[in-house]
């Protein structure tokens, strides 16, 4: 059974241990027993093809699976056509970079729905996504898996149901289930095993068992407000906001899933990814 754990970007300890270069990341991850890494391009895809390939070779040597977080500027549901077109270009840039790294998955945000209805926003996002997939095909990136992410703020497009609906567009799309975001936008709604089981069942019922088994995920504890949702990312030391990883680990075992779980803790993402792996292994005992 292949399951992948790793961080989103580097923990504070990466530089503290004297590491400086991207090519040193796989060696750094090895000490934690991790086998995944999500390269961060939230502020734009700025890595060259050559540097991406060099990083990818170092990752492959340590059997690290690479994914990439596409720019935050992406807004598939924007009312401005210019921004929707730019979003397609950002997706193309992300695909090019992750392919150079030897990866296939890119995580994208869907956009906002603060000025229009959620249904109108979903319609715009779906239309933009179809155009993006066509552009990926034309560019020769038809094997890139686009992973729309569940979002933490209430006025963002990205409920579980909206993300799953987006993924019905094409089988190459995989949902990125951010459990911390879902907990934040439901004001602490993920507590019991049944709460998490419902997420897994929703994916399976709408997208089928094969895509459930390979789903992409972000996990962190997140502080939230009672009117807007997500406020800020925390570490696993938090005992107030949650969610806890144990019900996720149990659900993964019960459904025989093989996901990629990326930790987005604030500054301790590698350390907390290792804790998630330990929780997962203990759940299977």
PLM region descriptions:
Residues 60, 77-177:
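Active-site acidic/histidine proton-transfer and metal-coordination neighborhood
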Residues 25-33, 47-67, 93-102, 133-141, ...:
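Acidic (Asp/Glu)-rich catalytic clusters
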Residues 8-12, 40-44, 71-75, 111-113, ...:
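Active-site beta-loop-alpha junctions enriched in small/polar residues
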Residues 132-229:
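Acidic/histidine-rich catalytic cores of soluble enzymes
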Residues 1-96:
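N-terminal pre-domain/capping segments
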Residues 16-26, 48-56, 118-137, 153-171, ...:
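Distinct, well-ordered alpha-helical segments
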Residues 3-10, 37-39, 66-70, 106-108, ...:
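Hydrophobic faces of well-ordered beta-strands that scaffold small-molecule active sites
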Residues 270-285:
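C-terminal helical cap(s) of enzyme catalytic domains, especially alpha/beta-barrels
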């Amino acid at each position: 059974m292949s399951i992948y754990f790793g961080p989103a970007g580097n923990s504070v300890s990466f530089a503290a241990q004297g590491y400086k270069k991207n090519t040193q990341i796989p060696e750094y991850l090895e000490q934690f027993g991790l086998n995944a890494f999500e390269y961060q391009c939230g502020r734009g895809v700025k890595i060259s093809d050559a540097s991406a390939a060099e990083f990818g070779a170092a990752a492959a040597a340590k059997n690290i699976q690479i994914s990439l977080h596409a720019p935050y500027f992406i807004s598939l549901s924007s009312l401005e056509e210019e921004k929707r077109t730019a979003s397609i270009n950002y997706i193309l840039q992300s695909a090019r970079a992750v392919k150079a790294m030897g990866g296939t998955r890119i995580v994208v945000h869907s956009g906002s729905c603060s000025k229009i209805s959620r249904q109108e926003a979903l319609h715009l996002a779906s239309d933009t996504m179809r155009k993006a997939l066509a552009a990926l095909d034309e560019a020769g990136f038809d094997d890139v898996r686009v992973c729309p992410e569940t979002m933490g703020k209430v006025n963002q497009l990205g409920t579980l149901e909206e993300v799953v609906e987006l993924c019905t567009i094409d089988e190459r799309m995989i949902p990125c289930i951010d459990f911390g975001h879902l907990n934040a936008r439901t004001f602490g709604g993920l507590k019991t095993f049944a709460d998490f089981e419902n997420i897994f069942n929703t994916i399976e019922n709408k997208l089928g068992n094969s895509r459930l088994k390979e789903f992409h995920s972000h996990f962190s504890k997140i502080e939230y407000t009672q009117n807007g949702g997500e406020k800020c990312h925390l570490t696993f030391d938090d005992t107030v906001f949650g969610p806890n990883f144990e019900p996720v680990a149990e659900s993964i075992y019960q459904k025989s899933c093989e996901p990629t779980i990326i930790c987005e803790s604030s500054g301790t993402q590698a350390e907390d990814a290792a804790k998630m792996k330990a929780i997962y292994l203990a759940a299977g005992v």
